[in-house]
């Protein structure tokens, strides 16, 4: 397949106001932002990507401007043989600016979304679904309903069950009494179906050592981000040695070297890179291979719009991982564009053979939510 040149690269920002905010142990989302990226080559072929932009609440538009005003001009006249070339080039070309501004995160997230769009375009040009281009043999995978808030958790889970979900993840870190009450309610509702919890980095090591062992009575699939991602590995080792519940994390790890370090510490049983937050397809596919090689479970993290969700599904199918995270909360910016991922049956979904990501977003259908 011959190389291509990008004729146009553009980011589009949207916000959907929530009737019920999404609550975590560190903050809340009063709307659901989505930052979509569209890349078009000189032959008229195109691809779509998405940038993580959940926090801070004012961050989505800033990342959109990084793409439109800084990254897009870097494509002028460049022939591209493979998306990974541009991932490496953009990362290197913006590294000093990101360091100077203290904005390594926003730049990495913007580049991740661009990378996803280039891979979609690349797979379309090769007339293959992305999951198969990346080496996958089946588009079928397990999914779980995520983002279950501490308020109305059983009702949210029940609605997810009605949509076909058979595995769930509850947000905790709101005090033992409240957390345990929600877990009891969920266990009563779902029985022995898989149930994970996410602390969202909400505990320091002291409370983690106190609270985590008490969760074992609920027979959890995993305990996600019990302490801050930047805490010393010694704290993670201490916690791991106190519990039998598998520990999950990875959404707040960025960079191949840092993922390699995490794997070498042998603490995380479930590794959760977020392709829209760091790495895109290029970086996260490489990490996923190392996760599987280390005999850990690869479960892509994702909480955003539909394009990034579908990209995460393709990564999971390509690397035969564990579970796909599907947000259980209302979000038309997700549901309008998630294709097969929205068709959950008995806890599973299946990607088809449509080239690229297999979706064709109609931005006109969500125009009233556009902010940039």
Residue spans of the language-model regions?
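Metal-dependent enolase-superfamily TIM-barrel catalytic cores that perform enediolate-based chemistry
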Residues: 132-243
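Shared catalytic-loop signature of beta/alpha-barrel
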Residues: 213, 219, 227-248, 253-348
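Structured beta-strand/loop patches that form or line metal/cofactor-binding pockets in enzymes
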Residues: 1-48, 52-56, 330-335
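A cross-domain feature marking catalytic cores of carbohydrate-active enzymes
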Residues: 51, 145-148, 170-172, 197-201, ...
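Conserved, mostly hydrophobic/aromatic
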Residues: 6, 37, 44, 71, ...
